């Protein structure tokens, strides 16, 4: 069934605090503003911040909204997110399924991005993106198959 991303998840766009609050002494929350430390599934951290405006929580999907648009990682810690990321939290689908459906539709998100030099996607375009969403049983099967 076709649904928008906003119907199956909540989208929080990142916002960068002043760099005066950044550190590499692990004070405050880990801070990500793009995909430079993304791994295959989870990011690593090289910057922390003692002040933040926007956050991601364990289980959220981290989604790049600036070039490259559409890279995803799973959030396993409470972190601060900057302008290059959105935190997407599943509301009506399985969290791990949300990760897979976003990953599978990366080219669709890239096509919806704009910008002549640096591609980006805004919250409205992201939340209104139409996705083919599987039933709860199919989601469970997909998650189980992908984890195996």
Could you say what each language-model-derived stretch is?
Residues 79-86, 115-143:
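A short glycine-rich beta-alpha junction/loop motif
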Residues 33-35, 46-104:
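A short beta-sheet element
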Residues 70-72, 112-115:
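Short amphipathic beta-strand starts and helix->beta connectors
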Residues 1-16, 128-148:
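Non-catalytic DNA-recognition/assembly elements of restriction-modification systems
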Residues 18-26, 114-115:
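Short coil/turn segments at secondary-structure boundaries
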Residues 4-21, 30-58:
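Sequence-specific dsDNA recognition surfaces
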């Amino acid at each position: 069934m076709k649904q928008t991303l906003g119907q199956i998840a909540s989208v929080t766009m990142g916002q960068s605090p002043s760099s005066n609050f950044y550190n590499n002494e692990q004070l405050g929350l880990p801070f990500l503003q793009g995909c430079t430390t993304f791994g295959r599934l989870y990011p690593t951290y090289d910057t922390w911040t003692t002040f933040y405006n926007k956050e991601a929580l364990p289980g959220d999907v981290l989604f790049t909204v600036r070039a490259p648009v559409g890279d995803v990682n799973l959030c396993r810690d409470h972190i601060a997110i900057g302008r290059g990321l959105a935190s997407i939290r599943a509301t009506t689908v399985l969290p791990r399924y949300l990760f897979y459906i976003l990953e599978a539709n990366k080219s669709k998100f890239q096509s919806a991005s704009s910008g002549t030099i640096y591609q980006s996607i805004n919250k409205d375009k992201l939340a209104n993106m139409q996705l083919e969403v599987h039933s709860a049983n199919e989601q469970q099967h997909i998650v189980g198959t992908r984890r195996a």
